[in-house]
Amino acid sequence: MNDTTLWAELLAYGTGISLSPLHIAVLLLLLGPKPVVRGGWFVIGWIVTALATVTLLLTVGHTLVLDMTQGSDHRTGLDLLAGGALVAVGVKELLRAFADGKNPPGWTRSIDRFVAMPLPLLVGLGAISEVASPDDLVLFAKSAAVVLAAGLPAWQEWVGVLAFTTGASLLLLLPLGAVLIGREKVLPWLEKGKQVLFAKGELVVSAVSLTLGGYLGWQGVSSLLLR
């Protein structure tokens, strides 16, 4: 795998994590009271959690000396598991989108309650939610696996971790940055973005999950064919 492909994969896996109902929570925080404080701390908690999780997985991989090269048992198993999990999530979100029709998804009510929580609880639950879902966990694991397989020196591993974290945080950082520059100017755009995500969020998550799941499944099958 060349460097360009590696960084592209890490950004893609990170983006898959950032596309969740929690990134809609940031829009709601920025539309509510104390937007910079509450939204800023939430995003900081998200970034720290992403950095800590992928760093921990890399440390475990180095300690156990796991072989993550293409065609190895560990890599093939992870690719097939991750691909299957993401395809399952994509199909579930697609079916849910059709079932909801024009009605707001059921999780929108949970998001409204979530963003009304006290700030420490909000940040803590956001961090837990980031690593609790199976689809996010397989993306964290896959990101650590491709870095391990590349056999990079330590400083380049850190670049890889930062690339992944950037992808995982980009959709949260963009609206926060826009509010820091000029909240009044971007409020209509944030409100419009919230409405679009409430209406189409499940379809977006489904498309990304199916795309990444199909790619990882193809990698797993390719590894099996190499044997």
Where are these regions (language model features)?
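Alpha-helical transmembrane segments
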Residues: T5-W7, H74-V91, Q156-L170
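Alpha-helical transmembrane segments and their membrane-interface junctions
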Residues: A127-V146, L212-R227
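Membrane helix-loop-helix hairpins that form the core translocation module of multi-pass transporters
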Residues: P35-T108
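Small-residue-enriched transmembrane helix starts and helix-helix packing motifs
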Residues: M1-L19, I44, W107-A132, Q156-A163, ...
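A small-residue-rich subset of transmembrane alpha-helices
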Residues: L10, K34-L64, A141-P188
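Transmembrane helix boundary and interhelical junction motifs in multipass membrane proteins
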Residues: S18-V26, A132-S143, L172-L173
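Alpha-helical multi-pass membrane helix bundles of inner-membrane/thylakoid proteins
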Residues: V89-A132, P188-Q195, A199, V204-A207, ...
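N-terminal signal-anchor/start-transfer transmembrane helix
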Residues: Y13-G32, V36
